């Protein structure tokens, strides 16, 4: 799909190209109380009041998400007009813009429209310019067109009729909007990869499959990749990671993917992704109902790989390292047992009180390994705890960090990207819940504040650099009729790296 940008100030008579240019459809916004957007006012004038007459007739009331097509419109170059309800003008927000864009794309994708002129990016979203509107609209469109059908006997290969979108933006935002469009396409491609990896079944998306995916990213985009196998992992004395992996016949993989967009001496940002490609719970077996969704327990790894692909396509001037420890968590005669004590790469001993708290056991060794890169920051991403879902539901990703500056950067990025996160506490008092009578620490801290104690566990292995933990258990996938991976938190991570790179 092709996206292009054209500057236009609808209020100053510079819209003639949009009025007369050939297009299958032009998209206009309509607020409640019969208030037209700037573009809609100009089109209304060019069509001798057609838009106003339609609104006064009650065919569209401006409520958020309502749409109406006008056909065979005279006075303009577009053969159709799509009116999109924007809701109340005084309540128009970032979310309302996203909902309006989504409604527009859904309406358009149900037609044979090939080329569309999209004016909504210029709507007055508080604290957002039209370049932001372009990016959000492209991501909304790509979300609407995403399909996962490759595992069906007859995959749906049908492509939408829509092939070209022309965005009208404020002239001052023209250059920034072109950058935003490029970044949005790269981000959408990274999110699609993340969603594909999450949606694949566990018998396909194995640790070896993830490793091969990393190799393909490296080959396609010129990155450096190292995949460590069992013997190399053993040589590094990653006893905690290996204790989880040993219960499965699938061999563990330890993936290191490096993107170098800045000077070699520049300290990298390290992203660590939990890669449990299927989590049965191990000996602490999960209930059968809903266990199929434990194929999504590698979404931390998937989001890290998707982010790396997006960063490479954007060409950001920053160094980034992705680390993915990946294995299955399965019950077997040689699997971890409750009460076992294992030794981590750092040398700390861990009492495994619950084998279903395995994510932290593989991440802790990866966090220790990250030290060798002398990182500017380390961010781990994991579907770590059901407790985070209880605390935050399915809207906000849980953010934990003792570094206020790093946490602030991530929260700013989450707001800019529309990929919300919420900071939760990481006070030292919670560490007491991880005490063990027999080892340096236990892998669980009881029911109270389960997401916090999980983050506290990880913090023991991330003391030598700025560190943050993202718990995506509630945001990495959806259940029910809309079951599927979401691609989150790729937008948050990518925006954080864009900001760090100054792009």
UniProtKB/Swiss-Prot annotation:
Binds 2 manganese ions per subunit. HAMAP family: Cytosol_peptidase_M17 (MF_00181). It is found in: Cytoplasm. Mn(2+) 1 binds at residues 279, 356, 358. Mn(2+) 2 binds at residues 274, 279, 297, 358. Its main location: cytoplasm. Its EC number is 3.4.11.1, 3.4.11.10. The gene is pepA. InterPro entries: Leucine_aapep/pepB, Macro_dom-like, Peptidase_M17_C, Peptidase_M17_leu_NH2_pept, Peptidase_M17_N. Presumably involved in the processing and regular turnover of intracellular proteins. Catalyzes the removal of unsubstituted N-terminal amino acids from various peptides. The active site is at 286, 360. GO terms for molecular function: manganese ion binding; metalloaminopeptidase activity. It is an enzyme of class 3 (hydrolase). GO terms for cellular component: cytoplasm. Signal peptide: none annotated. Its cofactor is Mn(2+). It catalyses: Release of an N-terminal amino acid, Xaa-|-Yaa-, in which Xaa is preferably Leu, but may be other amino acids including Pro although not Arg or Lys, and Yaa may be Pro. Amino acid amides and methyl esters are also readily hydrolyzed, but rates on arylamides are exceedingly low; Release of an N-terminal amino acid, preferentially leucine, but not glutamic or aspartic acids. This is Probable cytosol aminopeptidase.
């Amino acid at each position: 799909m092709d996206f292009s940008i054209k500057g236009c100030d609808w209020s100053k008579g510079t819209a003639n190209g949009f009025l007369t240019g050939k297009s299958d459809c032009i998209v206009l916004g309509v607020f409640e109380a019969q208030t037209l957007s700037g573009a809609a006012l100009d089109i209304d004038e060019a069509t001798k009041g057609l838009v106003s007459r339609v609104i006064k007739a009650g065919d569209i009331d401006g409520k958020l998400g309502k749409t109406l097509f006008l056909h065979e419109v005279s006075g303009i170059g577009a053969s159709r007009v799509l009116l999109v309800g924007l809701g109340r003008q005084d309540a128009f927000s970032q979310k309302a813009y996203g909902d309006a864009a989504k409604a527009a794309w859904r309406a358009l994708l149900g037609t044979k429209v090939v080329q569309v002129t999209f004016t909504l990016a210029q709507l007055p979203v508080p604290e957002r310019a039209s370049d932001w509107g372009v990016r959000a609209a492209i991501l909304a469109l790509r979300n609407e067109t995403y399909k996962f059908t490759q595992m069906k006997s007859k995959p749906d290969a049908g492509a939408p009729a829509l092939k070209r979108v022309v965005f009208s933006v404020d002239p001052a935002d023209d250059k920034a909007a072109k950058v935003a469009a490029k970044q949005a396409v790269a981000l959408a491609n990274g999110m699609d990869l993340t969603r594909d990896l999450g949606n694949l079944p566990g018998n396909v998306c194995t640790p070896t499959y993830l490793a091969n995916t990393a190799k393909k990213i490296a080959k396609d985009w010129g990155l450096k990749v190292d995949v460590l196998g069992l013997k190399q992992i053993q040589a590094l004395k990653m006893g905690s990671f290996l204790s989880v992996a040993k219960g499965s016949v699938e061999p563990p993989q330890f993936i290191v993917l490096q993107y170098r967009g800045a000077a070699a001496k520049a300290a990298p940002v390290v992203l660590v992704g939990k890669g449990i490609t299927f989590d049965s719970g191990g000996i602490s077996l999960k209930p059968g109902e809903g266990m199929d969704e434990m194929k999504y327990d590698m979404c931390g790894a998937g989001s890290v790989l998707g982010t790396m692909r997006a960063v490479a396509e954007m060409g950001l001037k920053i160094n980034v390292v992705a680390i993915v420890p990946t294995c299955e968590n399965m019950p077997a005669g040689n699997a971890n047992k409750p009460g076992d004590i294992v030794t981590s790469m750092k040398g700390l001993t861990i009492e495994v009180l619950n084998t279903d708290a395995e994510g932290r056991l593989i991440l802790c060794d990866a966090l220790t390994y990250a030290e060798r890169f002398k990182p500017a920051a380390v961010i781990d991403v994991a579907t770590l705890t059901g407790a985070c879902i209880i605390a935050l539901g399915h809207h906000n990703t849980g953010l934990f960090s003792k570094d206020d500056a790093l946490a602030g950067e991530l929260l700013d990025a989450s707001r800019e990207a529309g990929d919300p996160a919420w900071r939760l506490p990481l006070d030292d008092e919670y560490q007491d819940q991880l005490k063990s009578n027999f080892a340096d620490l236990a892998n669980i801290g009881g029911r109270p504040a389960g997401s916090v104690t999980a983050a506290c566990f990880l913090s023991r292995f991330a003391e030598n650099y700025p560190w943050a933990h993202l718990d995506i258990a509630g945001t990495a996938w959806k259940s029910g009729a809309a079951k599927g991976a979401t691609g989150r938190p790729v937008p948050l991570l990518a925006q954080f790296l864009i900001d760090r790179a100054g792009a």
